[in-house]
Amino acid sequence: GYEPSMEITCTDGNLQIRRIHEDGTEEKTVQQVKHPGDAIRQILKEYKSPVLENMPTFTGGLVGYFSYDYIKYSEPKLKLTDETVQDFRDMDLMLFDQVIAFDHYRQKVLLITGVMLEDLEASYQKAEKKLQEMADLIRNGEKEEFPPLELESEIKPQFPKEKYCKMVEKAKHYIHEGDIF
């Protein structure tokens, strides 16, 4: 994806949506939700990508992650403890309607942008302009040098080895019993 048009995050039911408009302005909404999936489904109703032959399977949409803790929205009976809760957002997604895809098999770069159907002619012209800007960036963009990454702190395991091994054995038992998968 290239230049997200929206960022969606949720932690403990606190859903934040940041829309990034073409002119660079931003609109942020925050709301308390019981299940963030409802908001995601509503957003996805506005964005549909056709499946086209000779195109990658991903031509735009949501990219990101759902943490392990996201299960609490679908299975509220599960009581997550401080020991099991990770220090991550429950979900962190970005909406991309511009994609630079590398087809390694055909040795081609594909530039993709979404077109909204409300005002098709104006939307098509905007898409042409975006595609030209993307092509110019690839052809003329400057290579950015980054310094080597350095760890800011020592990597430490979250649990001692013995405790971790016990947790794995317990999980295997639950899998065998059909309680988890």
Show the residue positions of the predicted features.
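Extended accessory regions or peripheral subdomains of proteins
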Residues: 1-32, 68, 72-181
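Short acidic (Asp/Glu) patches
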Residues: 36-53, 76-87
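Short hydrophobic "helix-edge" motifs at membrane interfaces and signal-peptide entry regions
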Residues: 54-57, 167-169
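Short, flexible active-site-proximal loops enriched in glycine and acidic residues
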Residues: 48-56, 139-146
